[in-house]
C-alpha cells in the first residue's frame, strides 16, 4: 500500500478550472510529447482520473503537468489532463498554466515575456504581460487550425436533423450554427446541451472519419461547439463548448475559438489580421486574432489553414497537496452518470 502525493497549484482561466501539477508527476518515456502522452495514458492514467474525477475533482476539472521540453526551441513541455483524457492541446489550460507557472517561479523563460511550449499538438508560442508578481494577460499563438468538413448531417434528440461543420483548433470540434432545427444557445438550457452533446459526438464519430493529416493519434471528434449571438458589447459571437462527459466550458475555450476562427476564415468571413472576440456561457471573453494564413499538407490532402492566436487571463486560487492513497476505495476517482 502506498500514498502518492501531488502538489498542485489551483486556479481558473476566465472561469474554467485549471489544476497545475507542480510536484509528483511521473517520469515519462518518449522523444516527443505525443509519445510521452501515450506512455502516460498507458501506465499512469490513474493519476489523471484520481486528480480530475470526484472526490478530488469534478466534471469540469482540467489540469496540466510540466515536463522538460523534448525539443530545443521550447522552454517547457506541458501534458494536459482532464476528465475526458489527455487533450493534445488546451487553450484555457495553457493560459492558466502559464499564468501560475510564471507567478510561482516554476518556469524561467529564456526571454522575459515570452515562452515556447512543447505540447502534444506541437509548439505553442506564448506572450504574457506581467505587472510585478502577477501575470495579467496571456496570448498564445496556436498550432495551425483548419476547417475539416462542412455540412455533416447528424440526428439530434429533441431537435431533429442538424448540419454541422467540423474544424480543428488543437482538437476536432463540431460547430452547430443557427439553422432550421437549432436557433441559438440562449434558447436551450445547459442541461439540454449536456444531454445532447455526447449523443451527437458518438453519432458523428460513428458516421464520419476525423483524422488529422499530420498527427495519427488525433483521430476523433472530441468537442461540440454550440453557437449564439453575443451579449457582451465587445464580442462577435458567443459559444457553449461541451467536452468530457458532462462539462460545458466556463471559458470561451481556446482551441474552440481557434477552430471557430478557422471555420470563419475558410468561408471568407475572417482574414489575416482580423480580430475575433469570443464570449463564454458566463460572459467571459477571449480575444482571438487570425495571425496569418497557412496550409496543412498531408499525404492524402492539403487543407487551407490559419495560425490563430488567443488572449485571455487567469487567476490562481490556492495551493493543494492531494493524496491518492491505495487504501482508499476511490483512489482513482469516480464519475456519476
From Swiss-Prot:
It is an enzyme of class 5 (isomerase). It holds the Pfam family Pro_racemase. The active site is at residues 90, 253. Substrate binds at residues 91-92, 223, 249, 254-255. It catalyses: trans-4-hydroxy-L-proline = cis-4-hydroxy-D-proline. Keywords: Isomerase. The keyword Isomerase applies. One of its GO terms (molecular function) is 4-hydroxyproline epimerase activity. Its EC number is 5.1.1.8. Catalyzes the epimerization of trans-4-hydroxy-L-proline (t4LHyp) to cis-4-hydroxy-D-proline (c4DHyp). Is likely involved in a degradation pathway that converts t4LHyp to alpha-ketoglutarate. Can also catalyze the epimerization of trans-3-hydroxy-L-proline (t3LHyp) to cis-3-hydroxy-D-proline (c3DHyp), albeit with 170-fold lower efficiency. Displays no proline racemase activity. Belongs to the proline racemase family. This is 4-hydroxyproline 2-epimerase 2. It comes from Brucella anthropi (strain ATCC 49188 / DSM 6882 / CCUG 24695 / JCM 21032 / LMG 3331 / NBRC 15819 / NCTC 12168 / Alc 37) (Ochrobactrum anthropi).
Amino acid at each position: 500500500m502506498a500514498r502518492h502525493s501531488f502538489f498542485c497549484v489551483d486556479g481558473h482561466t476566465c472561469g474554467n478550472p485549471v489544476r497545475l501539477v507542480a510536484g509528483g508527476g511521473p517520469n515519462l518515456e518518449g522523444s516527443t510529447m505525443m509519445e510521452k502522452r501515450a506512455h502516460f495514458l498507458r501506465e499512469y492514467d490513474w493519476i489523471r482520473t484520481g486528480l480530475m474525477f470526484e472526490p478530488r475533482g469534478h466534471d469540469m476539472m482540467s489540469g496540466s503537468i510540466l515536463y522538460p521540453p523534448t525539443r530545443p526551441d521550447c522552454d517547457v513541455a506541458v501534458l494536459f489532463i482532464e476528465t475526458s483524457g489527455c487533450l493534445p492541446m488546451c487553450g484555457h489550460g495553457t493560459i492558466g498554466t502559464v499564468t501560475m507557472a510564471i507567478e510561482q517561479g516554476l518556469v524561467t523563460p529564456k526571454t522575459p515575456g515570452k515562452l515556447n511550449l512543447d505540447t502534444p499538438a506541437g509548439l505553442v508560442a506564448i506572450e504574457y504581460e506581467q505587472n510585478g508578481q502577477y501575470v495579467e494577460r496571456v496570448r498564445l499563438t496556436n498550432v495551425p487550425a483548419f476547417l475539416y468538413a462542412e455540412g455533416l448531417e447528424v440526428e439530434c434528440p429533441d431537435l431533429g436533423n442538424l448540419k454541422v461543420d467540423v474544424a480543428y483548433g488543437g482538437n476536432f470540434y463540431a460547430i452547430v450554427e443557427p439553422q432550421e432545427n437549432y436557433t441559438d444557445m440562449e434558447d436551450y438550457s445547459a442541461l439540454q446541451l449536456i444531454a445532447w452533446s455526447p449523443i451527437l459526438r458518438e453519432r458523428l464519430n460513428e458516421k464520419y472519419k476525423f483524422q488529422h493529416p499530420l498527427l495519427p493519434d488525433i483521430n476523433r471528434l472530441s468537442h461540440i461547439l454550440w453557437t449564439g449571438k453575443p451579449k457582451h458589447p465587445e464580442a462577435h459571437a458567443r459559444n457553449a463548448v461541451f467536452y468530457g462527459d458532462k462539462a460545458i466550458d466556463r471559458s470561451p475555450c481556446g482551441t474552440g475559438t481557434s477552430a471557430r476562427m478557422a471555420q470563419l476564415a475558410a468561408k471568407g468571413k475572417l482574414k489575416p489580421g482580423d480580430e475575433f472576440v469570443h464570449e463564454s456561457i458566463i460572459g467571459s471573453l477571449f480575444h482571438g486574432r487570425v495571425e496569418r494564413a497557412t496550409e496543412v499538407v498531408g499525404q492524402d490532402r492539403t487543407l487551407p489553414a490559419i495560425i490563430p492566436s488567443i488572449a485571455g487571463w487567469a487567476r490562481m486560487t490556492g495551493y493543494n497537496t492531494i493524496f491518492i492513497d491505495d487504501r482508499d476505495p476511490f483512489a482513482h476517482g469516480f464519475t456519476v452518470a
